[in-house]
């Protein structure tokens, strides 16, 4: 019985979420690590799949999710031109801890800061970590809420599946 409950919980954590985030990235201002304001709609991957990861620097599951996807990008996704973009959503007020976090952990992804949580709210992101895979037209291909060990393999598999649809 316990095994069935555990399996159900794991399935809910790693299966594409029933909650649907907004399909397109809305025109909300976000910030680079250097504090420059950019419009979120400028985030794209030149007609290739892209992975968007929402994270908080202080949350253990967010960090594990971000680190594993960053490593997958470095070892596998980058050579397939699949871009990974991370959006930090724990910056209500101060942001000076985010750049040292990114540089100190040698993250191989582009990172932006959602200072007031406007992008997260507008996209309907329920909580972090939250991962969205976009297709070549920046439509949501699939999305995942939460983290569990090995999720990066499933995300890589879905991203490559999306890429293969483009290449056909």
Regions found by a protein language model. Name each.
Residues 26, 50, 128-130:
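Short loop/turn microsegments at loop-to-beta-strand junctions
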Residues 101-134:
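Short, internal strand/loop/helix patches
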Residues 133-168:
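Thiol-/selenol-based redox modules, centered on thioredoxin-like
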Residues 63-104, 116-121:
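Structural microenvironment flanking redox-active thiols in thiol-disulfide oxidoreductases
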Residues 1-24:
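Bacterial Sec-dependent N-terminal signal peptides
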Residues 40-63, 69:
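Short active-site neighborhood of thiol/selenol oxidoreductases, capturing the structured segment around
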Residues 19-42:
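N-terminal "domain-start" segment that seeds a small globular fold
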